[in-house]
Amino acid sequence: MTEGSGYSAPMDSDSSEVSPVLELRISLRGVSPPVWRRLLIPEQITIAQLHHVMQFAMGWNDEHLHRFIIRGWRYGGHRDGAFQFFDGPDTLNLAAFGLHEHERFAYLYDFTSWWLHDVRVERRTCHQRSGPLPRCVAGSGRCPPEDAGGPKRYMNALEVHGEHEFLEWIETLREGQIDVGDLRVEADEWLIWLDRRFDRRAANERLRTLAR
């Protein structure tokens, strides 16, 4: 068992080089509407780097523990002042597994809330890809709030914060005096639950910080 630091070295974003590229589809289990991302990543990416890529692409804030489960082996980390990894994920790259097309593995985020992600290798190619890597090429659904409590509680909260309840809240605004400060806070709260759109451009802006 080894111990190392978290993400530090930049990923190679030079699109002129021809190197193995993996196309991954990441799906968050147990939520509806579906939350998923399709990513292009260099096969030489380490497990530690993939953790950061998935956090940025999905929209998580990296506030909790995580674990990868690949072919029955677990790779994860813990916080102790700074983020640290165990089982060598900061040096072990995906190429070492020789992942095949259509092969799957799992990514677990937050051991209390249990956000489980299914990761599927859709394609493996050695052809040149234009643009920086890693990159999100498709996706749908906004990531749940960090403190939503897991898929079941999140789905229950969506029912509480549905469109009907939102209209009732609008009616209460019409009936009473409005404090602008409180209104802004409450409106932001409703947007968290009602706006389920995925902003791919914003996700790629976050991912570009890893390629520098």
Feature map (PLM): residue ranges:
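Short linear regulatory motifs enriched in tryptophan with gly/pro/ser
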Residues: 1-212
